[in-house]
Amino acid sequence: MSWLRTSPLRQSLTRSGSSSGNGSSGTATTMRQRPIDAATDCDPRACYDSFCKHWQQAHEIIQHPGTPTHDDVLGVVSHLDYMVTLLLVELHHCNKVSLPSADAAPPAAPCLEYLLSENLLDKLYEWASSTGRYANAVRLEQLKLYELLVSHSRHQLLCHEPFLRPLLKILASSQGEIFPPDLEKRLVILLNQLCVVLMQNVHLLDLFFFSAQTQVQEQIQNGSLPAPKSGTTTNFIIFSLLIPYVHREGSLGHQARDALLLCMALSQKNSNIGHYIAQYSSICPLLVTGLGGLYSRLPNSIEINSIDWHRITPDDVTEIPELTLFMNALEFCNAVVQVAHEMIKQQLLDFMYQGFIVPVLGPAILQTNIDSQISAMSYLDLILRSITEPGLMRAFVKFLLDTEKFDGERILDALVERLHSPDANLCMVTMALFDTLLGLHCEDLMLELLLKYMLPGKHVPISHRHKINKIDPYLNTTEFFLELTPDVMKRARDLARPKSVQELVDPAATATTTATAPSMLLSLPSPVMSKTIGANWNYYGHYTGDSLYANVQAYLFEAHSRIAQCQRDCRKWANSYRYQKWPRQGQARATAHALELARQFFSEFGTAAPVVAAPVASEAGEKQLDSLQSIGESSGYESFKWRPADEDAEGIDVTTTTTASASDTDLEHNNNSSSISSGRRDSWRISHSSRNEILLTDLDFSEDLFAQGTVSLGPFLNAIWSKLQTFTSNSLYVNLHLTGLITRLAWYPLPLIHSLLLRSDIAITSDTPSFHQVLRMLKQQIDAELPVAENSLEIIDVARSYLIDREFRLVNARKITDNSPLHQQLQHQQQHQQLAQTNSHTQQQQQQQQQQAQQRSTYATLSAATPVQASPTSAYDPFRRSDNKRRSISRSITSMFSRRSTSSTPASNGNSASSGLSQIYAFFTGAASTLVGGSGGEGSGARGAAQDSTRGNTCETSLSTAPRQEPQTNVGSSSNSSIGSSTQTLSGTHSSSTLHGVESGLQTGNFNSEPVSLDSVASMGIIANTSGTERSRDLALCAVLLDEWLKELAAVALEQSVVLVTEQLL
């Protein structure tokens, strides 16, 4: 994808003297094709005589008066070819490594000395300027000659003026010229080699730089060198010649960008070059405008061919030529910011922000079309994942948080709003973008998204705020998350567990382990997954082909590495973001304000002042104080903040502790008595054994005591929690991104985030249900709609096998394109299965009955079974979204009480004769299909026709939140949930996955035509024989996913507690 990764720039810096570099390796000329045998002994005198003879013949042609003819040019080029060959032989022998000796003289190079002493290159340039229409051909041979000499002689020739002066002349005359492609290639190669030589010999940089300034000006004044078309003389002519080729495609652009990067790196070593590039060159505006132009060529709408697509991959970049050019330009800008001089870096960042990020990316992201939003956010996600320079990253973060450029609307707020989008693709792309943003570990982003809403601590009751910064090492949060596992998954795990635990653990320690830590058994891989869990996981990033399902050790290792990386990045932040309590000392004005609020509070309630004014410890006083203390425990307003007993050592101001009096007279009366003051302090501490102590300095009276439960955690967390509440209605892929995003938040080793996500002992009072409350609701919903039954366990097993199969496909399979043979094979299999499904429905029913009977007998020995493993080319999809097994309650009730037409069939007439109450009862017990949809035989026989006739129906809002489905006869595994729970949990928005399947069917006109991806390989052979409605299959998939996610959260909580307790002890 990147030109920089495959660029010869990495190898160019370590070239040896005998190597020819980029240019010489690509030279396809006659002089390079001639074999030069290094082992052949050449007579230096003979070589020198031949060299001089060829130059004499070429010089005679050059001296001819008049315009050179075609034969003259060919003659000079031919003699020049022989001269270059002799020079190569001489330089090759001069560069040989030989053992030093006392009488050894430096190797002689008579041909090169003759070339320099007679100014042959200068004479050749003067003649080439008068060749007319053959000027480009002669210039091409000159560039080849300079290229070979620079690559073979390294830096020695640059020190000689007879070589440097004609080289600068030919380079200066090339400014502003338009050359043919072969000449441009030679010029860029020569410039690249010069940059490599200067990079390796920095001491020549000033000589070359100032020579370009003085000598060219002298030649222009003397008339021997034409003035450049730009009208000004450049100081660093190599850099100015490379600028026009920065956005070229192919190898020419690669060579030019390599050379420009070397020039940028040279600016770090020479401030004159950095000042020239920043002040007098147009490289920064050119890079930014070119980047904006390349972005405008990107597709405004990305064609999505898979239901799980959420971001642009390197394969996508390779397949889209416009995206490849844009990424090349972006990575070049990133490299320039990394290696260039500080002046150049700052100028480029300013131009990037003002010329590309704000005017180009901003309007693109704020578009209203969903397809345009998906493409723009995908490009932004790709940009953020590609750039590595912190300065450039800060520019994009500033762009997300800027409130002045877009009429007061922040880009970050617009992105948060899109988390509520009902479009599954837009929601997944948005969550993938936020996953990238959270992975940056940026302090500013985390402050705006989360921390600024959590720092005041108002979302935590006052009695629990002291726990935020203190981690209890004995708090077992792991058990809390594991207890939230749905009951059906617990039952499936019990059935999958072997009868004798001693086979997996030490027999001597089995009893104690089971009694003390029953949750430890969950870390043991279940035998059902014995052939698929990561037994060969080596923790070095090598995937051995085994599944990571139920592998808690892998979760622990992943959590440990992620938390450690996040901790290293967060240590660089400017603030620690720990909860700060109300200050006890100083700030007299704030203390006086707190006193006034306290007086107003006690004067309103009127009962607290007499109680605390008298320093007595009577039983009545104790009861009153206990009743006052109970306000913080029992009332819903959390009036007081409790202070733990371990804070007794902290100093307390006496005057601060005597502020419990409710009137000024009581305060003045007791000011002169220290004993009464101490007695008052003791009156607040009736029992020293009490765990919590009340101190008015810990009371934040500025808070509204009756505003508990209205504190917002911010739009980002509210959007995440609202999406999590619809967990059972979301598509699988949305839930995968949602759980991954929350897990990434849990990796942050910050006490505030840890208390919000991983602390079960801290209550949260906000305007939305807390994270733990949402998890409890999901457990209750799944338990109610998917009870522990034989059919539910069967669907759970199929869902688990589907997820494992998906894991194998994602890891081992390559991307399936529309034109690939595998995709064509899958389409052929799907068409064949559609035909076979309508012709062999009776056989499928028989096989289903046999499998159910066999599974009843084998469920007791489920631990010895191996889950179904479908190959990537199989047609197994246990959750085919197009299955018509769900009904709308509105249509069912309408069909119950509506008057049937006289032309209805006998079957329909018979169904209409059924009572309405029986049909309602049958609907909620899963048998409505047999009452409303006709007899069993007719319903079974008409399954394919019913699917074809209803695939064009639109989706309606109903209790089931799904498209209207035709009646089915299979009701064996329907959920027996109550009406209340169904109404509460199923009245939300439509399921994204279900709607997506319907939309795809409408567009293509094919019932089974879902967008093809690794996860849409329809495996219908097994799921067709699995009983249960589509809702039950969706719930089973959610249950398996929730079970695995809870294990991951338990592992994160365990590792996070270790990290925070360690920091607390240090």
Curated annotation (Swiss-Prot):
Show the InterPro entries listed in the entry. Answer: FHIP, FHIP_C, FHIP_KELAA_motif
At the top level, the lineage of the source is Eukaryota
The protein's matches in Pfam families, at most eight in alphabetical order, are given as: DUF5917 (PF19314), KELAA (PF19311), RAI16-like (PF10257)
Keyword line: Phosphoprotein
Q: Does the keyword Phosphoprotein apply?
A: yes
Chain positions found as Phosphoserine: 500, 820
Q: Where are the annotated segments for Disordered?
A: 1-35, 651-682, 821-913, 935-1007
In what ranges is there compositional bias, type Low complexity? 12-30, 655-678, 822-855, 890-913, 972-997
Compositionally biased region (Polar residues): 1-11, 856-874, 947-971
Q: Which family does it belong to?
A: Belongs to the FHIP family.
- Name the record gives this protein: FHIP family protein GI14169
